[in-house]
Amino acid sequence: MTKIALIQQPASGSRGENINKGVAAIREAAGNSANLLCFSELAFDRFFPAQPAGPDRDTLAETIPGPTTDVFTALARELEVVIVLNFLEMDGGKTFDSSPVIDADGAILGSTRMVHVPDYPCFHEKGYYTPGDRGAAVYDTAIGRIGVAICYDRHYPEYMRALAVAGAELVLTPQAGAADEWPDGLFEAEMRVAAFQNGFFTALCNRVGKEPRMEFAGESFVCNPAGVVIARAGRGSDEILYSDLDFSEVALSHARKLFLADRRPALYRDWIES
């Protein structure tokens, strides 16, 4: 059994303050026997894509490894936990919406970059993010095989299926979901279906709190491979959501016993490219 913790915390205007709060949350969660800890999208900053990118955009970004990963790799090593972050990455003059995955020995196993980049009111992301160029990576961690679907990528069944085909047992979604952004129930329904169709656990960690241009709902949650919500955080609450996962459920799921085995990928190219 693996215990995960989704850190649903509000962000102030101080990155240092937010990182310190995150460190305290990880220590608390590790003290409560959590083995894997995940933050929301851009957890250590106010949600700057709420307004169009300006000339200061690059000052918001940092490298991987860099100052933020240095803090959390040391913490992962000390506490022997897996940590998934999310922030604006700078690499080769380009910026990405990135989630470094840090193993329990402090090693950075890799960094998932958001592939699909939206742009609509209060989510002016095309001005900040270059579309990810690394595909749907799955990481062998101390607790199991995990993938990351950053925010908007969760809407793409091709992306979620790619994680399943690569053997993901758990898919984490660092999310920035505004209050009342979606019709009631749809927020969870999408991830429940993804879990059921692909035979993995899904865990969505959402931002929370009022910011100058918008309010984030929280309501982080975890689904099992049967598509059932097994843990749910409160609306608007600053909290750590815990959930115990039994990865033996993955192999027993309908998706792993039936759906994936019966795929016919030779037919799909013509369908999706037409």
Language-model regions, residue ranges each:
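Short polar catalytic/cofactor-binding loops
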Residues: 8-14
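Residue-level detector of high-confidence beta-strand sites
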Residues: 98, 111-113, 173, 232, ...
